[in-house]
């Protein structure tokens, strides 16, 4: 295509139509935001790192039997994915207390959560992504009972797989969010998995290696993302 059609632009990605009606192109931006868009910066090469990181994780999960929308990486900043009918729910797994959970429940940051917690949030920027429960999801028609159970099952499976993967790289997977969608009547993992959407700590120092570095003004965001990628063996573009 000579001129692409942008279907949606979010905080960190642009979604383009592709030559196939069943496929989309994800373009990873350098934009970084926090606090519902109140804090926004451009961090050079972040989009390239996240694209490579996401491709690595999605391919790993597919190899372990997790159905994802990922098809292939197209270039340094873009990937081709299946066009899903997205379910407007974020599935958040927490292995340690941090972020909003610590604030909401007064739990000390870093406390190990056993078993891990699973929370659901409605994807709605205007409402600031409120927490919801499975009853809300079914009552308001966001997903069926069967889909909710499948999202729960796949999310906990991903947690087991990625916690082990990151542990081998001397990293703690503190928490993360997943989104799912439908394609031909089947449920697939959608969106992305990158340090933008999870918390990762160094296993020894507990240094934050994720977007919290941006939220808290710690600096070195791109460097931390690149270090996480390096430990996992993610091949990065030369400029990164």
From Swiss-Prot:
Reactions catalysed according to its record: 5-amino-1-(5-phospho-D-ribosyl)imidazole-4-carboxylate + L-aspartate + ATP = (2S)-2-[5-amino-1-(5-phospho-beta-D-ribosyl)imidazole-4-carboxamido]succinate + ADP + phosphate + 2 H(+)
Pfam family, one: SAICAR_synt
GO biological process: 'de novo' IMP biosynthetic process; cobalamin biosynthetic process
Top-level class of the enzyme under EC nomenclature: ligase
Protein name as catalogued: Phosphoribosylaminoimidazole-succinocarboxamide synthase
Family, as annotated: Belongs to the SAICAR synthetase family.
MF-aspect GO terms: ATP binding; phosphoribosylaminoimidazolesuccinocarboxamide synthase activity
Gene transcribed to yield this protein: purC
Cited HAMAP family: SAICAR_synth (MF_00137)
EC number: 6.3.2.6
Keywords: ATP-binding, Ligase, Nucleotide-binding, Purine biosynthesis
Keyword 4Fe-4S: no
Pathway: Purine metabolism; IMP biosynthesis via de novo pathway; 5-amino-1-(5-phospho-D-ribosyl)imidazole-4-carboxamide from 5-amino-1-(5-phospho-D-ribosyl)imidazole-4-carboxylate: step 1/2
Cross-referenced CDD domains: SAICAR_synt_PurC
Species in which this protein is naturally found: Acidithiobacillus ferrooxidans (strain ATCC 23270 / DSM 14882 / CIP 104768 / NCIMB 8455) (Ferrobacillus ferrooxidans (strain ATCC 23270))
GO cellular component entries: cytosol
Keyword Lipid biosynthesis included in the entry's annotation: no
